Amino acid sequence: MFKDTLLEGKRILVTGGGSGLGKEMASEYAKLGAEVYICGRRKSVLDDTVKEIIDAGGKAKAHACDIRVSEAINDMIDEIWADGGALTGLVNNAAGNFISPTKDLTPKGFEAISNIVFRGSFYITHACGTRWIKEDIKGSV
């Protein structure tokens, strides 16, 4: 459907890229020529996904990181930038959830989910965005 080199020269970070939709997106981006970075909390899951991508001929690297921690995000983004230049794309895929009827969802449960989805997405988008603006780079989220 797409030209095999569609994303050649692109450097894309997929949060929550070790499993599920994030893994599938990262794998497809790599097949289309992108250099892919994935992050998540479970290092072993990330490493398995990176191995699969590399074994399929792609380029990928993993960073274990909790996106709820802004300092950890900044450190990770600094490492990625130092590893070959600026990212050109960011996919905010990381999410948290658990099965619970709405009537049983507690404020603490909602906070656990929203810290990943809202705050984590903001922290990582802000970390990339401020660097893109500073370096006059057109990144994509």
Predicted feature locations:
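Conserved glycine-rich Rossmann-like NAD(P)H-binding loop of the short-chain dehydrogenase/reductase
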Residues: 34-48
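Conserved NAD(P)H cofactor-binding loop of Rossmann-fold oxidoreductase domains
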Residues: 93-98
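A short, exposed helix-loop element centered on a Lys and neighboring polar residues
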Residues: 125-126
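Substrate-binding pocket helix/loop in short-chain dehydrogenase/reductase
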Residues: 101-102, 106-114
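Conserved glycine-rich cofactor-binding loop
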Residues: 11, 16-20
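Active-site loop of short-chain dehydrogenase/reductase
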Residues: 10, 58-59, 85-87, 132-141
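The beta1-alpha1 cofactor-binding region of Rossmann-like NAD(H)/NADP(H)-dependent oxidoreductases
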Residues: 64-75, 107
